[in-house]
Amino acid sequence: MADSDDEYDRKRRDKFRGERESYRTERRDERRPIGGAGGGRDEWSERNPFRGGGAGGGGAPRHRPDYSDYRGPGPRARYGSPVRDMPPPKRMRSDWGDGDGRPGPRYGGYDPYLMQAWTDHYQSMHSAYHHASHPPPVRELPIIGGDTLTQPAMLNLKQFLDTQDENISDSEVMRKYTEYKTDFKRQQLNEFFVAHKDEEWFKNKYHPEDSVNRSEEQRGFLRRRTDVFVELLENGTIGSVKVDSSHGDALIRVLDTCVIKLEGGTDEDLKVLDEKPKEALVFDRKPESVDPTTVVENTPKSPKKEKEEDELPLIVSPQRIALKPVNSDDENWDDAEVEDAPPKKPEEEEPKESEPIPEIKQKQKKEKKKKIKKRKRNSSSDEESSSSESESSSSSSEEEEEDDEKLKAKYDVEDGLRAEQKAEAEKDQAEAAKAKLGSVSPKEEISPEKSAADPEVEGEAKEDGKQAEKSPKCDDEKKQENGDAAKVESAAEPATGDAQGEVKPVTIDLDKVNPPRAMHRTSSIFLRNLAPSITKAEIEALCSRFSGYLRTAIADPLVERRWYRRGWITFTRDVNIKEICWSLNNQRLRDCEMGAIVNRDLSRRVRPANGITAHKQVVRSDIKLCARIVMNLDEKFKLWSEGPLSKPSPASDSEATAANGSGSSYGFNSKNPVLQNITDYLIEEASAEEEELLGLSGDRKDGEGEPIERDEQLLSVLDRLVLYLRIVHSVDYYNHCEYPYEDEMPNRCGIIHARGPAPSRVTSNELNEYIKSYEGKLLQFLTKTALLSEDQIKDLGAKNADTEVEKFVQANTQELAKDKWLCPLSGKKFKGPEFIRKHIFNKHEEKVDEVRKEVQYFNNYLRDPKRPQLPEHPGSVKRPETESVRGPGGYRPPMYTPMSGMPYSFGGHMMGGGRGGRHFPPARRELPLEHHRRLVGYHDLDAPSNSDIFD
């Protein structure tokens, strides 16, 4: 008990051991006398004045310790830094992941991104700036982890100057500060790439292999959508609908038709769009508990289904045969009898509805008893066979006679059964003739089928019986019986087919007609929280075990959500989606709570846009913009060309002019049907001469406004372009946005914005402002994505493949001794480095290729002008001086009343002022905060009025 008491007392005070461990040795142990106890946390029991001195409390009681021993005699010593008077700051923990998320070295000692060198360099620079008199602010600490929300704060020019020599020149300072900013940006790109390069979403964007596969997959989706659009355009479906909010039902029908076609549906499946009320009622009844008897009464079944239901119990639960010792012959014979029984059951269960089934079962029981008695005699005769050979010969003759009797009895029973079946068949045929218009029940259909097969079965059974009499051994008899059963089944199959052919007009036609499938209606689950390390394949493997699973969509991560992602899992409409959602909520994937909830159906699929879009001038402008967007997107994905999908490259002058709309024509060089003859609708027309002659001016129209002028021909051209963008490229023109990864979402064509109700009048200023602002909103689709040039990515730290391969070889060439070199990749030793180099290129070629791919991977990330990265730290962003409320060290300057005077040289350092040409103060020359005090103004009331007043 002494040990346990001591252990309990020690653990009782260990709650904050980790937090105090870092400063215990500095603060407490240095001030304690040498002769004092040095155990620190291990001596809490000795420091407790209410406990005994021994471990178990049995020693002499100790005196109450003098706490001055921990500080030493006299006044407390003041150390140089005030940071020792306070505990260290609280250690923050990340929400997910362990450590900084950076993987270990993949290539041995080869560090391609120089992460350790970056960290050491910038930690030393930041620590050089922060002197020992002040701790570094939390916002300026170097942050290494890859899951932070912002980049670490970059030193401004004043802070950077504090780290340099006082005698440095201005030009040298600016040169070094420019280098510091460039290196700082390179470090942030390096850290972000290393933190996310193993994640699936990052590989799909920039990996040399995964990005190509993803692009080809997206191109396949677009080609499929293009084929569907062309089909609908040719059959007139696209031309018969208007992108107007008043035609919402027609728009929804077109979108649903596209979805059914994309899912592989046929024209028969499109009929479900006309049966929406009926389909909704059926769906509402599915989750409810329905009485199975009512369903059986209302829905007729085919003979095939009835036969399958009868045979199910024979296959579902087979008997497990126990292994017995060889000597127990009786039990083994019985097991063999059970083993032989199942193949005969299909023959015996066919006349299941006939009356004499109890008599058949009684005869079978008698046969089984005879077999058991006979085989018991066989086992006893086998045991006594060693005594006399005559007894064994007599037992074998008895066995053959009993087997013959058994076979005769068996076939006599079958003959009686066939006669009964014929009688039942005649009765059934008579009943069927009476009820000509009535529906034939499945039970009445089965018996004529089996009666038609009876003559063949009887003939084959007699022939097999003769062969069984001639066979001398029991094993041969068993084989022939098994063969007979197979022959009976094979002979019964064509007979049943003929019998089914007779009742085809009644039942089979109903069974073969497939109802239209509502392939545009789905059920889905929304995953609110997916860690970046979770892959799409893992979610698919988790959800594919549920029936009705279709696809999975995962969104790109968001920096404000710590790179966590959202996901959508799509199922068919007829599944119990709440049960699946409950099952997913009870599971964790990579220790991540996915947060699964049921995704609701879309509330409003057609949403109105500004009604001014129906005006003729706006429509003509929209046709221009739509045509430019269509050309850019078609060229990006090579939809109407046979060439392979090419990556975006730096735009040339000719491409830039075409992108800006200054090209010679639209549609002349394109095979896209929606761009054919598009230039005929882009030429504006106006009666300028007539207005000039009649003296009509536009000022009067501007004051009163002009009514909305509609041009149906222009609107039909615009509608084709808008629907092409929406169906093929998932671009909602009137919402100036793109719906990403729509082919993997639950609704593949869900929402569309259409022209809303038009106003009565509109002024020309409103038209011009609307056209100009709308073009700015669509700028992301009008401009081509141009990658950075080689010179630009070199400034960002681009890598050379040959240089990195050479570094990889050097890192894996280690000298052990003279003429003794080691290759860490294989552990082999060589006489010189040239042999290791040859060995690496011959035996570890996949490692070298991986280094080259890694270089290309990193350079692809740098080339993207829209690359994902952490936002800049708020302290690094330039702000007006009025917003700056902290000094350079992160401390708030002293506050003053509005009417009080500022202290001397207040603007020199604390507000960024100062004298001289550089405006840089000397390093750390300000007084401590406690020395700053407010100057009290004094005014002598007896002084004359014209004297100077100091306030």
UniProtKB/Swiss-Prot annotation:
Region Disordered, annotated ranges: 1-108, 283-504, 644-664, 864-893
Quaternary structure annotation from Swiss-Prot or TrEMBL: Interacts with cbp20, Dcr-2 and pasha.
Biased composition, class Basic residues, residue ranges: 363-378
InterPro entries reported for this sequence: RBD_domain_sf, SE/Ars2, SERRATE/Ars2_C, SERRATE/Ars2_N
Phosphotyrosine: residues bearing it: Y79
Residues that bear Phosphoserine: S81, S302, S328, S354, S441
Residue ranges with Basic and acidic residues bias: 8-33, 40-49, 92-103, 341-362, 405-434, 442-487
Name of the protein: Serrate RNA effector molecule homolog
Modified residues (Phosphothreonine): T299
Ranges of Gly residues composition bias in the record: 51-60
Source lineage: Eukaryota, Metazoa, Ecdysozoa, Arthropoda, Hexapoda
Keywords on record: Nucleus, Phosphoprotein, RNA-mediated gene silencing
Biased composition (Low complexity): 387-396
Annotated function: Acts as a mediator between the cap-binding complex (CBC) and RNA-mediated gene silencing (RNAi). Involved in innate immunity via the short interfering RNAs (siRNAs) processing machinery by restricting the viral RNA production. Also involved microRNA (miRNA)-mediated silencing by contributing to the stability and delivery of primary miRNA transcripts to the primary miRNA processing complex containing drosha and pasha.
A cellular component annotation (GO) from this entry: nuclear body
Source organism of the structure: Drosophila pseudoobscura pseudoobscura (Fruit fly)
Biological process (GO), any one: primary miRNA processing
